[in-house]
Amino acid sequence: MTDIARAVPRSILYTPALSLNRVVKALSYDADVHLMDLEDSVPGPAKAEARNICRTALDNAPPSANIALRINALGTIDALHDLVMLCSGQTTPSFIVMSMVRTPAEVVFLRETFASAGRFPEIYLTIETVEAITDLDNVAAVADGLIFGSADLAATLGVPITWSGMLAARQAMVLASARHGIGCIDTANYRLSEPDVLANEIQCVKDLGFHGKATVHPSELELINSTLRPCESALLAASRITDAVKAAQGGIALLDGHMVGPSFARMARNTLQSGKAWAARFSRGNS
């Protein structure tokens, strides 16, 4: 397992690029990353205007904004137009989210295309195809982060979006992201009128090893943030573990009736490092 020290968003708010006012308003919500969507949420005839909306929003966003843009699947003409727009403007989003990824070569191609234009965004991949799942270690090796796309994967598998139906894919993502030290973000919740379902799902994916969660509605941000963002109590507990193991000269220590040792200290250091990285990049106090 690779220690995770990079800044990983804990909440990503998806907003269709259908209205400039809507996109600008979304920037006011307390999300770590504000994503403008050019893919599924934008009908084909509206995609050209959606690109204009994204370009205007990017060029007028504050420098501290952590903006992402989800592009159309490579191999489509819409993806080509997306790339031309992104590489010809004066501002590039912090994150590019790819859709329907199947092979590592697609990610390498996109990264090299941006680099040729002097652009170096972080590239997150929507994991929603069987091909990506079955080659996940190689796919994750060329990514900066993974985002679970449950709807398309469930449609391909012919199963409903349930915890048991999606568990194998989620576990594979967590293992791949841990191996390569990259972010792992859970799928959006589609049962918007059932907050108890959302709360349970957030806790379950946190326990599984996910770092963040996507959402399509700002009303979910408070619950996502309160559960997944670094909190003072967790950071304090991690600090106490590292101190206890250090005092035991790197061996086994007893802390509040619990045995802790080197592996616990390594996890605690990861918690402290990732919390510090998150605060430096995403905390609104640094905006």
Features from the language model and the residues they span:
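Expand to "…catalyze enediolate/carbanion chemistry for C-C bond making/breaking, isomerization
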Residues: 1-287
